[in-house]
């Protein structure tokens, strides 16, 4: 795909990375100071266990890394505008091993980023929980948080609530609309560049390799 897109200048692809158009995470991106970040936690809690037992259980190649964790990986890469240096992946299928879905249903990724930033990402597909993208961004003097209790900023030992419309589903259409407008009108800038998608896939492949080989990549 990479070489085909480089050869055919009139070919374009996009991806369903809708967290980029979520107004809360766009706010987080504006609020961070990259040099001050030292740790990020992102948890994709799927909350729709029943979906595992449809086509996902029948597809040998299906991976919770590419089907769930990828969204948090992209979110952190997009917010920081950084690509990880290394990744170690741990996984199990304890909740689902006696079901139709025998693949790993929980993955945990530990990533090293430039600027001495560490990140922990999990994708939990079998939890008895609502669907949510939890995020914590730890900086020297503040923490940005989104969880089941809402969205907050901790600063100077005080807690400030962030008024947000998370999960902000109405904004998801902006991504595909941007792609269509780009193809039709040619006067729009793509929200997701080709190179960003290839960088994201390379991280996911490295995470998958680490999981299978049980070592850092």
What feature does the model see in each segment?
Residues 12, 114, 180-217:
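C-terminal helix-rich "cap/oligomerization" subdomain common to oxidoreductases
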Residues 11-12, 18-100, 214:
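Predominantly a Rossmann-like dinucleotide-binding segment in NAD(P)-dependent oxidoreductases
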């Amino acid at each position: 795909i990479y070489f085909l897109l480089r050869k055919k200048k009139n070919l374009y692809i996009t991806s369903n990375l809708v967290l980029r158009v979520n107004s809360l995470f766009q706010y987080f991106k504006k609020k961070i100071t990259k040099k001050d970040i030292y740790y990020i936690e992102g948890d994709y809690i799927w909350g729709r266990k029943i979906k595992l037992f449809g086509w996902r259980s029948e597809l040998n190649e299906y991976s919770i890394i590419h089907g769930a964790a990828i969204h948090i990986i992209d979110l952190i890469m997009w917010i920081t505008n950084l690509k990880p240096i290394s990744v170690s992946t741990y996984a199990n299928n304890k909740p689902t091993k006696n079901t139709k879905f025998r693949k790993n249903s929980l993955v945990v990724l530990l990533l090293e980023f430039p600027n001495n930033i560490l990140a922990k990402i999990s994708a939990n597909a079998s939890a008895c929980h609502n669907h949510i993208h939890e995020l914590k961004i730890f900086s020297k003097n503040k923490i940005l948080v989104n969880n089941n209790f809402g969205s907050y900023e901790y600063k100077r030992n005080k807690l400030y609530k962030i008024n947000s419309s998370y999960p902000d589903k109405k904004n998801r259409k902006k991504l595909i609309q941007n792609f269509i407008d780009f193809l039709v009108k040619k006067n729009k800038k793509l929200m997701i560049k080709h190179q960003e998608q290839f960088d994201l896939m390379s991280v996911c492949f490295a995470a998958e390799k680490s999981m299978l080989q049980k070592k850092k990549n």
